Amino acid sequence: MSLKLAEKEQVVATLQTRLTRAQATVVAEYRGLTVAQMTVFRAEAQKQSVHVQVVKNTLLKRALAGTPFAVMDHLLKGPLVFAAAEDPVALAKLFTDHAKRLEKLVIIGGVLSGKQIDAAAIAQLSKMPSREELLAKLLGTMQAPVAGFVRTLNEVPSRFVRTLAAVRDQRAA
């Protein structure tokens, strides 16, 4: 099915707006995947706020032009699935997990912070903690000194109450 010029321009414009918000992109070969497998993959991607799209390479090259993701132009050969996301770790985990389960999904490469990365780098990125986990660790680290200070302040009245209870018990005996 060929697209009309206006439809092609709209696809390129949509991709460019998604790329402005994206921190990372990945392309993978999907030849041999069933429709059901691809549907499950897309649903999983949507849950993790990852935009996944099968798009013509020429349209994708036009969308990538003038962006930090243009370094991946030479990777765009053959039928590919393109993905972009604000969270690079979620993107990497999605592709790595599905590539393990679906041998037909082959990660070609991607871009992170304006630098091209290969499948091995994407696999390494997938092993990092997610954004939520990192924020939880940061919050715990920030709260630890305050919590310790509160416990120290609470210890003074507690010690005083225990001393009074000991004096009361001693007088009662």
Curated annotation (Swiss-Prot):
Molecular function (Gene Ontology), one example: large ribosomal subunit rRNA binding
Keywords assigned by UniProt, alphabetized: Ribonucleoprotein, Ribosomal protein, RNA-binding, rRNA-binding
Gene3D superfamilies listed in its UniProt record: 3.30.70.1730, 6.10.250.290
Annotated SUPFAM superfamilies: Ribosomal protein L10-like
GO biological process: translation
Family label: Belongs to the universal ribosomal protein uL10 family.
Stored NCBIfam families: PRK00099.1-1
Protein name: Large ribosomal subunit protein uL10
UniProt source species: Acidithiobacillus ferrooxidans (strain ATCC 23270 / DSM 14882 / CIP 104768 / NCIMB 8455) (Ferrobacillus ferrooxidans (strain ATCC 23270))
Lineage summary: Bacteria, Pseudomonadati, Pseudomonadota, Acidithiobacillia, Acidithiobacillales
Encoding gene per record: rplJ
